Amino acid sequence: MKCKIVTFEEVHNMVQNLSKKIRSSNYKPATIVGLARGGWVPARLMCDFLGITDLISLKVEHWLETGKTRDEATIRYPLMADLRGKQLLIVDDITDTGKSLIASTNYLRKFAPGDLKTATMQYMPTSAFKPDYYAEEVKVWTWFIYPWNWIEDTTTIIVRLMDTKKEEVWSSNAISTGLEELFEVRWNQKMMSHMLRIMDERGQIGRTKGGYRLKETKVVHL
């Protein structure tokens, strides 16, 4: 599984470019709907770029963990908002299957909005739903590690890596090399040390002579 680390500067630039496309289309949303969890930060940035103060959140459950999905996307918590006649803009970080956008648009249409459009930072042609606006088309399937989920994603792929040789003691360098070989991603040593410390505190790994050993952890393989 190919992974790519996305910096906050890259996120900022993608949302800024996305906002320019929306303005150029003359669509003027009154309310932005950020899809939780991945769409929260892009939605807030979009509010800033478009000068919109009305922001609501919609929790859509689709991804279980890094690279693993449910069969269908579902709305976790119902909205208690009056959206009748409003121009809505749904914002998410990426669409690769399209299930989150399909579920959210179908749900929000029940609120009788005046209009409803969708925007994502990134769009993969594998998606069953093409958003109205996107900043970047991703032609090769990639798992993007955004600033808001780098701990969640990186701990998951480290556990998967260490589970391939669960009895071994892994050094920090061996983990870095393994991540690069299996997932095409590499953290610098400072960030790797920080990540391993977090995993040790959470009880996912144990520090031992020569490095770290994986503890009993549920591992989902792709």
What are these regions, as identified by a protein language model?
Residues 1-222:
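PRPP-associated nucleotide enzymes
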